[in-house]
Amino acid sequence: AEEMKILFTDDNALYNDIKAKNELLEKYGESCRHNISGKTVKIPVTEAAKSLRNKSEWMMEHIRKTEWVTDGEGNGWFNGYYDNNGRQVEGVIDEQVRMMLTGEVFSIMAGTATEDQIMAITKSADKYLYAKDIGGYRLNTDFHEIKTDLGRMFGFAYGEKENGAVFSHMAVMYANALYKRGFAAEGYKALSSLYNAAMNFEVSRIYPGIPEYFNASGRGLYHYLTGAASWYMLTVITEVFGVRGEAGD
């Protein structure tokens, strides 16, 4: 659509100018607010690819520089959230370390995290999120508050559902991301921790399989709400055993 052409504007000066970016988006919105012209334009595939690649590279570098947080003890990870009041969620907040797994998974998987940053993230996750007896990597540290401006997770006690449980699909995606970036030992730790927890019937109280999550006492819950088993199989086959194509080949 002709209206979309403006979105392919490729200019580093624009990317660094918040006001100019908002003006461009407003102009695009105005052009298609009530109707679409129906006109089309041709953009060379190479030009579109270059524009999208430059946008992604700028964005990733921006995240590396502005969203990296540390605990003052040599550990670091990415802040992945802002609450509904526009406040940074992760880092050391009120002298309390706050870390969430999801932002680390996608920064690693997408290639945003550098190798040095991945090493720091895995070290931090082992320190703040890992709980061997209940399946491995929790979704988040305990915030010690009911933070209603961050979503449904605080509708649960710590260790249940999205609030600090070992959420299987995110733990498997963490493993998958680590394998993709060459951190096989760290990825295997995440996979084996889930497996060992699931097979420990005396604690998990489940038939063999991958539950949606393991709670604070290590019990596995809600197999029927997750697709984590398929992620697990995909990771074992394509990453652990390496049986996969390359970019569709």
Predicted regions and their residues:
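Acidic, mature catalytic/reactive cores of soluble proteins
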Residues: 1-249
